[in-house]
Amino acid sequence: VTGDASLDCIYQIALWSRLANRLHLVLFSGQAYNNQILYQTCQQFPWQTVFSDQSAFKVHFHGTSNALRNEMYAGQVVKDAIVDHFRHHTGHRPSVDKDADIQVVAYLKYDQVTISLDLLGYSMHQRSYRTEQGMAPIKENLAAALLWRMNWPKLAKEGYDFADIMCGSGTIAIEAAMMASRMAPGLLRQDQAFHHWTHHQPSLWEKHRQAAKAQVVNPNVRFFASDTKGFAIEQAKANAARAGVGHLIEFSQRPLHQIQNLSEKGLLLINPPYGERLGEQLDLIPLYKEMGKIFNEHFMHWEAGVLTSDPMLAKAIGLRAHKTYAFFNGSIPCQLYCISVNPDNHLRQTDSGHTQMLANRIQKNLAHLKKWAERQGIECYRVYDADIPEYAFAIDKYGEYVVLQEYMPPKKVPE
């Protein structure tokens, strides 16, 4: 997203954006046909109007071309141009440091370079409260995006409660509480890079900070977060306390089968495990079936959101999703399944006896063949070969890939 912004607007974004990843100020664009032209383009810019020669800086360079094939080398060219500019105009040179006050970002595309200043100096998902994290943490801005897609700000105003029954380090519940409290995520940090920017106005920034603090409210919402692992709950409690919402969230350690009815209406949002390998996915089917059962028994009239990478696992829940949204959890493409839990959205029978037999057979074959393949150093082998006549296909595993091939049907099928 690009646009024009005043200093007031920049400070508002730094304080209030829950979804953004970086906040960059574009300084200039110019030609970069080769390293000499890149140097000239960057050396002639008035860098002393951006930061002082007393500040340390570093350069991030992204992109290559036929002439500039190495990002590290191109970044060094930009760095040299900046240093030489300061030396010529001020008689001093700024230092270069990996933990620099100022971060210059260069993007090269089609022999054109765009130079920007990273106004914060860190990814905006790093709110600073999550120093404790579980095995598969979800980024704060992704958690916030899921909540926005589930209309959580609107639901919170209408008195809906919130629950995450697989909370891990508590990120989703914490972001939900911060949203409902109208707490600006930027208030949690005071180390923004723009403090070293020449156009920074400390008094104006403090004015916006105080205005943001004044907007914090005590929401009329109950927050529930649980997990099967005790250490995860302790981590989540510590994270929530650092975020300033620990007093709002009821944390508990409990397995899924001990989940009880919480309230009449609310939003349930979870990020359950989703295996990236065939065997792992099949092992997770019972968990997703149990989730569907729990939704029906304990979350009737709630809105539910489930983030998963596998449509097969989503189908195992047994409830119809009225909307899906595409996301990336890190490098994994996922879908957010939005489900209204109500009497009309019945729990469907997701498989027959035969399909359960098929799943059991594939799991059994995998358990046996996986150990054998590891001992033999083999990555390619057949997992299933029409073992059950009703499912006449073969499944072959090639490293991380799976190929399914259907057998030709017989010319005549006996009546």
Q: What is the predicted function of each stretch?
A:
Residues 1-102, 340-396, 405, 410-411:
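Non-catalytic nucleic-acid substrate-recognition regions in nucleic-acid-modifying enzymes
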Residues 138-260, 283:
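Conserved S-adenosyl-L-methionine
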Residues 220-222, 226-239, 250, 260-261, ...:
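Conserved Class I SAM-dependent methyltransferase catalytic core
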Residues 46-51, 258-265:
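Short amphipathic alpha-helix with an adjacent loop that forms part of the alpha/beta core around
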Residues 107-109, 329-331, 375, 385-388:
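A short catalytic or substrate-binding loop motif that flags glycine-/basic-rich loops and adjacent residues
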Residues 145, 414-415:
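Internal alpha/beta scaffold segment
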Residues 59, 106, 271, 291, ...:
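Residue-level signal for inorganic ion chemistry
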Residues 1-20, 61, 65-73, 108-163, ...:
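S-adenosyl-L-methionine
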